[in-house]
């Protein structure tokens, strides 16, 4: 599962992502909201984000994800969007690919930190 920042770097074809093995990642609905809800986003950027998202299953928030996110927030004091993204990865048994080193403290979640 990819974090919002990795989706942004993917759209920019960031060289740090070239070393990652090809996969068919999923993305949380939270990342979709973060990507499309950017203040001042242009029509061109919306088109680019939607084109990127077509290649990913967008995972909605289920009751199970909600409960895991609550547990993560209580245990680690993470921001709500990060807790939901991490909970989504944990619930699906996926590795969370991110550039945010803050996710490394979440012991319950398999995290791959991409160095930029």
Residue map of PLM features:
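Short glycine/serine/threonine/alanine-rich loop segments
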Residues: 74, 78, 94
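Acidic, PIN/NYN-like endoribonuclease modules and their adjacent C-terminal/linker elements
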Residues: 86, 90-116
């Amino acid at each position: 599962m990819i974090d919002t920042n990795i989706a942004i770097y993917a759209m920019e074809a960031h060289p740090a992502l070239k070393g990652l093995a090809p996969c068919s990642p999923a993305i949380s609905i939270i990342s979709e909201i973060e990507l499309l809800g950017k203040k001042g986003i242009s029509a061109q950027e919306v088109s680019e984000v939607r084109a990127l998202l077509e290649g990913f299953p967008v995972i909605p928030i289920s009751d199970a994800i909600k409960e895991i996110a609550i547990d993560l927030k209580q245990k680690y004091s993470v921001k709500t969007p990060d807790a939901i993204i991490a909970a989504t990865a944990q619930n699906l048994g996926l590795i969370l690919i991110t550039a945010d080193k803050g996710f490394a403290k979440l012991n319950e979640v398999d995290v791959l930190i991409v160095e930029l």
